[in-house]
Structure formats: C-alpha cells, structure tokens
Amino acid sequence: MIKRLGKAFLCNLLERQVVKLRSKHLFKIVAVGGSVGKTSTKLAIAKTLSASRRVIYQDGNYNDRLTVPLVLFGHAEPGIFNIFAWFRILINNSRQIKGDYPFDIAVLEIGTDAPGQMEQFAYLKPDLYVLTAVAEEHMEYFAGLDAVAKEELQPAKFSNKVLVNINDTAAQYLVGLPLIGYGLDLETDYTLVERHEHGLMGQKLIISTATGKQFSVEVSALGKQGAKLVLAAAAVADQLGIEQEGIIKGLQSIKPVSGRMQILSGINGSTLIDDTYNASPIAVKAALDVLYKTDAN
C-alpha cells in the first residue's frame, strides 16, 4: 500500500516536471510502443538520429510510468524507498528545466501490461509515435488481440504523427487512422525496394521513402526483423527532416545489441546467434530464419 502510494506520488511529480521541460525547451519526442520489438526499434532509431542530432535515450527498457520521465532527465532508477536519491533527482530536474536542455530529440519506449496504461503517457505529447507490432504478447490482462490493438493505438490520440509497422499490425485495426506506414514487400509510405543478404555479415537494403525517393544502405542488422528496424529508423529520421546523407550515416551505425540477434564466436570456430533477451515467438522465428539461410561452411 505504502509502496503504491509512494510510486503514484513520484509519478505525479515527475510528470509535472516533464510538462514544464516541454514548455521551456524546444525538443522532439519520439515514443516507441508495440507488443514486441520496442527496445530494438528504439535503439535503432536513437542510433540513427544520433549521427546528426543530440539525442537522449536509455539502453534498457525503461518503459513504465515511473521510469519514462527519468530518461528525459538522464537518470537511473533508484530504489522506491531511497528518499534521498529521489530528492536529488527532483532537484536536478528542476535545474535542468531552468537551464539549457542539451538535446534535440528524446527517444522513449512506452509499454503496457493492462488496458488503460498507455493513456498515462498522454502528457508526453509525442511528436511521433512508432507502433512496432500488435501481437499476442503479455496477454495476462487483455481479453484478446482486439483489446491489445486498442491499447497500443491509444497514443495515436495524443501524438502529432503515427508511424506503424504494417507487416505486424493487422489492417483491420488501422482503418480510418491518419498514419504513416512502413513495411517489407508492401505498398506503403516507407518500404524496401530490394534486400540482398550477406549471410551473417549483414545486408544491403534499397529503401523507398514517402516522397518516392530511393537510397541504398549497407547495414549489419540481420534478416527481415533487422530490415524492419532499419526501415523504422529511416522513416523516423526522414519524418524529422534529416537529410539523406545523415540518414544513411546513422543507419550504418546500427549494431545488434546484447541478446538480440547478436553474432558471437563460439568454440572450435563455431558461430552463435544470440537472441536470448526476452525472446518472443516472433523474434525466435526471425532468428531461426536467419540461421536456416546461413551457409554452414
């Protein structure tokens, strides 16, 4: 009871500080949500944008009501009962609000475990919301996929623009929504014209943008899932007005992170594909697809 009340009190204070930060400083917020792929997509977007902009983000999965505000101010989460640590955070936040905020873009991950939680992020007013997928993950408190879709699309109500992975979000949930689409092998705003895989060395992608422009880029991200990450990052960068040269440079900096399609050297000259971090069925299938296409020699 005390823990819950204390957390709610802190959340209210932090959220009010974020609102003040937004009112005092001009910076963009990109929020990433979805049933699967949030963290990988967030990191791909952040790495891409960092090539030409000052970007703040968090490497892990700070994505709930308490931790999301911490990302904007650059803090790690202390223990809920560490009163002095929280006091220092609140004081530091006030100083940042009054001073110079040294970032152009904040890339945030927002998550939900139950209906109604996404509405708690309305105060962020994202400039761009990225929906990675609507899938049957974390279903404990959802009646079905329709309920998941309704929840994951809530940010569309309070975001300036919405970017959706068309491959992994059923069309029936997107009817009538003003959105920007990205996907593989589909007619949508951002899509792949060609994809050439180089085994475990990466792949070459030719990307078509919303304005019809095309460009090619060599990336180390693997398989179709890796291509989706790159496509999402390219779409976000383009929507934020970054020039093509900056987009390509940023996309080339995307690297597999620990536990997510990471290539490791094993014993006796063997190679491992490490996709063990909180792997969903979709992620496991994607990793197996890469494995099956790899030359055993």
Residue ranges, per PLM feature:
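Acidic, Mg2+-coordinating active-site environments of NTP-dependent enzymes
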Residues: 25-27, 102, 123, 127-271, ...
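ATP-dependent carboxylate-amine ligase catalytic core
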Residues: 15-25, 50-150, 246
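Buried hydrophobic packing segments
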Residues: 45, 49, 71-72, 230-240, ...
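A short acidic, amphipathic alpha-helical/loop segment
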Residues: 117-120, 170, 286-290
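Active-site beta-alpha connecting loops in nucleotide-dependent enzymes
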Residues: 140, 257, 276-297
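Short, basic phosphate-binding NTP loop
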Residues: 1-33, 40-52, 66, 73, ...
